[in-house]
């Protein structure tokens, strides 16, 4: 795989055919303009003035919160607890094998970038993995040479699997020094982690929250509690990093749809209605190939930026997956990692193998590159359906101010 098909190359070709309406990595137009909000939706419950100004000025001690209902948290727990463990052989046969690897590569590049930043001031790195799942990022932290990792998730089965993965990794490491680890089952949208740490005074250099934070936007209280858990124990100069669906992109695609749903054969997003998008509790159902629907909530990113100021957090960047990919793929080390992780599919398919998508139109962008005759084969790409699915996400990074 000597040439990596850049999404921008794909977009430019797709746009030339479709008039630029639906490129796989198209930017949201008018990104700084908010989705349509009713007057009542521009305020949070109990506020008579701008909620964002009020939140930024709130004291460090949180206000007394009303008792929250169970909400959708139990659905999320059930969903992730019931996901079966599958081996590499089974995963490699999946329609979204390369898509999953691509998203995993994005996390690797993001985590690696900020571990390097922290290493410039300390080698004794402590990390909070907020929404650790089954431990998919353990090897990334091992590669980063961190000293301590706290893993927490709402799903108890996932936390147990994460802990077992850690024990297996440590057992196989022989003489290699492996970071210490702590495992907590907790709903980080409703419970304070600071009351559960083994070391009550622990401080973190990095909090990583991958494909999880959007679950907290069910209510302001939940989003604020999760943000507090992510940020309140960060050292000055520490980072809160993560990946989350891009609310602007989701709304743009919904508004362009004739129904309350959009997607393709890989993913589907379904909203209850269109036209009004409250700041919190804007629920939609997201389904990915081979994965049952699970409710998620729209994240209006400017609100997150304002809320983070309460915890002395400053946004240092927000990038779409397209932007981040274009930046990182220029790095030879990241490009090699992309290949090792099988994050892109080889095109044309190798002898005696098939492309993951049977639809010819899914590879029109790659075929055009081949027809140009100016690249060395095979090239690395994703099917158009997979590019469309992964392009709903963005990456973010906040820094704790002194």
UniProtKB/Swiss-Prot annotation:
Gene3D superfamilies: Vaccinia Virus protein VP39. GO terms for molecular function: mRNA 5'-cap (guanine-N7-)-methyltransferase activity; RNA binding. It catalyses: a 5'-end (5'-triphosphoguanosine)-ribonucleoside in mRNA + S-adenosyl-L-methionine = a 5'-end (N(7)-methyl 5'-triphosphoguanosine)-ribonucleoside in mRNA + S-adenosyl-L-homocysteine. It is an enzyme of class 2 (transferase). Residues 1-11, 55-72 have a biased composition (Basic and acidic residues). Its EC number is 2.1.1.56. One of its GO terms (biological process) is 7-methylguanosine mRNA capping. The keyword Transferase applies. Residues 94-401 form the mRNA cap 0 methyltransferase domain. Keywords: Methyltransferase, mRNA capping, mRNA processing, Nucleus, RNA-binding, S-adenosyl-L-methionine, Transferase. It is found in: Nucleus. The record marks 134, 140, 165, 214, 296, 393 as: mRNA cap binding. MRNA binds at residues 103-104. The keyword Lyase does not apply. Belongs to the class I-like SAM-binding methyltransferase superfamily. mRNA cap 0 methyltransferase family. This is mRNA cap guanine-N(7) methyltransferase.
């Amino acid at each position: 795989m000597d040439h990596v098909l850049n999404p921008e190359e794909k977009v430019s070709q797709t746009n030339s055919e479709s008039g630029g309406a639906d490129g796989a990595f198209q930017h949201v137009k008018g990104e700084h303009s908010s989705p349509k909000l009713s007057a009542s939706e521009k305020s949070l419950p109990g506020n008579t003035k701008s909620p964002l100004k009020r939140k930024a000025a709130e004291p460090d001690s949180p206000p007394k919160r009303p008792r929250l209902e169970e909400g959708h948290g139990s659905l999320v727990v059930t969903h992730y607890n019931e996901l079966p463990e599958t081996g590499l052989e089974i995963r490699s046969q999946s329609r979204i094998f390369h898509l999953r690897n691509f998203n995993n590569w994005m996390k690797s590049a993001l985590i690696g970038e900020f571990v390097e930043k922290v290493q410039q001031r300390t080698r004794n790195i402590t990390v909070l993995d907020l929404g650790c799942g089954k431990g998919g990022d353990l090897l990334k932290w091992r590669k980063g040479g961190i000293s301590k990792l706290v893993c927490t998730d709402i799903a108890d089965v996932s936390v147990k699997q994460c802990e077992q993965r850690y024990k297996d990794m440590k057992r196989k490491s022989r003489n290699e020094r492996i970071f210490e680890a702590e495992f907590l089952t907790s709903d980080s949208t409703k419970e304070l982690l600071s009351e559960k740490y083994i070391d009550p005074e622990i401080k973190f250099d990095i909090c990583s929250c991958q494909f999880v934070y959007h679950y907290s936007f069910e209510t302001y209280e939940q989003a604020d509690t999760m943000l507090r858990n992510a940020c309140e124990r960060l050292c000055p100069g520490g980072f809160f990093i993560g990946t989350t669906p891009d609310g602007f992109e989701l709304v743009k695609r919904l508004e362009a749809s004739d129904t309350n749903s959009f997607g393709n054969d890989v993913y589907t997003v379904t909203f209850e209605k269109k036209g009004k998008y409250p700041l919190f509790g804007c629920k939609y159902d997201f389904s990915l190939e081979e994965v049952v629907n699970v409710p998620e909530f729209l994240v209006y990113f400017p609100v997150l930026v304002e809320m983070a100021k309460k915890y002395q957090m400053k946004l240092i960047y927000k990038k779409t997956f397209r932007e981040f990919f274009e930046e990182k793929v220029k790095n030879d080390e990241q490009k090699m990692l992309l290949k090792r992780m099988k994050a892109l599919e080889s095109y044309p398919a190798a002898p005696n193998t098939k492309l993951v998508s049977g639809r010819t139109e899914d590879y029109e962008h790659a075929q055009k590159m081949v027809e140009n005759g100016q690249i060395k084969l095979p090239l690395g790409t994703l099917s158009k359906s997979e590019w469309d699915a992964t392009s709903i996400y963005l990456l973010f990074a906040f820094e704790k101010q002194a």
